[in-house]
């Protein structure tokens, strides 16, 4: 993981040959980036040691977010400056509402989570705040603001 960095992206490129924009963002976010990547929850998901009950709760919470993420993408498709950007975002939206949604449904079935549970689940306060930020930035903000918030959603 990149070490802490507080300079510009140009400075980062000069000090890190072959460095990528995402490397610079992660370096600027230290130590929080490493803390998130090494958090016990993140590690347990990655190595398969997450208890099924905890994973089911996580999936239910994440599923409450998917509807708002789909709406966010809809706003951004509408605001995208041209057909290439609209196509890329609508492709993501199609994937989210088909294959990713199917993953959730298969997972809920495998974990024994009844449809009434995940269909009526309320968002927790952190998810709700993040969803509201996404919807506000993409619906009321500029295209760039919406994309910036979308990036953070996809990295979390």
Residue ranges and their predicted role:
Residues 2-5, 119:
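Surface/interface-facing alpha-helical segments and adjacent flexible terminal/loop regions used
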Residues 30-35, 49-79, 98-99, 147-156:
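Alpha-helical bundle segments that constitute or directly flank the non-heme di-iron/ferroxidase center
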Residues 5-9, 26-50, 69:
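Short alpha-helical hairpin
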Residues 12-21, 46-56, 139-141:
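Short, charged, low-complexity loops and linkers
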Residues 13, 84-156:
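Active-site-proximal alpha-helical scaffolds that flank and shape metal-associated catalytic sites
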Residues 2, 12, 17-21, 26-28, ...:
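Hydrophobic alpha-helical segments
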Residues 19, 23, 31, 39-40, ...:
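Generic alpha-helical secondary structure signal
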């Amino acid at each position: 993981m990149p070490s802490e960095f507080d300079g510009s992206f140009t400075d980062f490129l000069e000090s890190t040959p072959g460095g990528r924009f995402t490397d610079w963002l992660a370096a600027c976010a230290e130590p929080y980036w490493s803390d998130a990547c090494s958090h016990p929850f993140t590690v347990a998901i990655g190595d398969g040691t997450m208890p099924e009950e905890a994973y089911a709760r996580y999936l239910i919470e994440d599923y409450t977010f998917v509807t708002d993420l789909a709406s966010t993408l809809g706003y951004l498709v509408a605001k995208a400056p041209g057909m290439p950007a609209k196509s890329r975002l609508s492709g993501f939206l199609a994937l989210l509402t088909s294959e990713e949604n199917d993953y959730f449904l298969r997972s809920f079935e495998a974990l024994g989570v009844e449809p009434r549970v995940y269909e009526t689940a309320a968002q927790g306060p952190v998810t709700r705040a993040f969803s509201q930020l996404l919807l506000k930035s993409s619906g009321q903000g500029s295209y760039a603001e919406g994309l910036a918030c979308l990036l953070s959603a996809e990295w979390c």
